[in-house]
């Protein structure tokens, strides 16, 4: 009876140990899977960093597409590659694709396909760049046109302002010139009047002097005649002697 009870008491312990071993095995399997995943990712990153090769999953998809196309068309020129054996595992796109395993026709087709896709992508990028350049050029032309129009509007406003100021100044100068011309005309008229008055005065003075000289001459003649009349005879002219 005591032996049975001891065997029952050891049973849960064995169960715990067995569960622990199973958990350890599961952890080991998970660690191995993690290591494999990390190694696969590392290989994938190293293969994707090469600039001269295409992406592995793209090459694999291109190869499968070509294989299906060959199977459908059954072209006699390029025989399709042999199908993989049934025991092969499914293709993992994360593993780098080895081009050296393909035959020459498939390699040639694959190269043409890659060149075709690269050329199409290049043409697409060139078209996008040309469209962007055209859009940028149109936008630049629009901005320049608006800037030039604004500058021309400012220049036109300044020209109008300067023209208005010039017209005002010309009017002022014309008015000043007319005023000075009138003043000069008045001065000329006054000078002419003064000159005529002076000429008239000069003529009057000359007439007065001539009249005075005539009167003086007449008076002298009268005096001489009176002297002659008193004496009755003519006598010698009186001589005047100056000095001793």
Curated annotation (Swiss-Prot):
Residues 224-234 have a biased composition (Polar residues). Residues 1-11, 32-46 have a biased composition (Basic residues). Residues 77-89 have a biased composition (Pro residues). Residues 12-31, 63-75, 213-223 have a biased composition (Basic and acidic residues). Coiled coil: none annotated. One of its GO terms (cellular component) is nucleoplasm. It comes from the Eukaryota. Residues 1-104, 213-244 are annotated as: Disordered. This is Uncharacterized protein F44E2.3.
């Amino acid at each position: 009876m005591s032996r049975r009870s001891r065997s029952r008491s050891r049973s849960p312990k064995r169960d715990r140990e067995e569960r622990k071993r199973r958990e350890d095995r599961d952890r080991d399997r998970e660690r191995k899977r993690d290591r494999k995943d990390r190694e696969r990712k590392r290989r994938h990153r190293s293969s994707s960093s090469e600039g001269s090769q295409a992406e592995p999953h793209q090459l694999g998809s291109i190869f499968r597409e070509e294989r299906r196309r060959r199977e459908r068309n059954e072209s006699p020129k390029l025989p399709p590659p042999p199908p993989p054996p049934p025991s092969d595992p499914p293709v993992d796109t994360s593993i780098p694709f080895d081009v050296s395993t393909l035959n020459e026709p498939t390699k040639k087709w694959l190269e043409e396909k890659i060149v075709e896709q690269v050329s199409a992508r290049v043409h697409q990028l060139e078209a996008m760049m040309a469209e962007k350049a055209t859009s940028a050029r149109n936008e630049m032309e629009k901005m320049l046109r608006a800037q030039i129009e604004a500058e021309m509007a400012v220049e036109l406003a300044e020209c109008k302002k300067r023209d208005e100021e010039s017209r005002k100044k010309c009017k002022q100068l014309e008015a000043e010139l007319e005023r000075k011309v009138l003043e000069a005309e008045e001065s000329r008229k006054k000078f002419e009047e003064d000159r005529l008055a002076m000429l008239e005065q000069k003529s009057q003075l000359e007439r007065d002097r001539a009249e005075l000289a005539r009167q003086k001459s007449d008076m002298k003649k009268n005096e001489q005649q009176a002297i002659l009349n008193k004496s009755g005879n003519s006598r010698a002219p009186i001589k005047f002697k100056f000095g001793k």
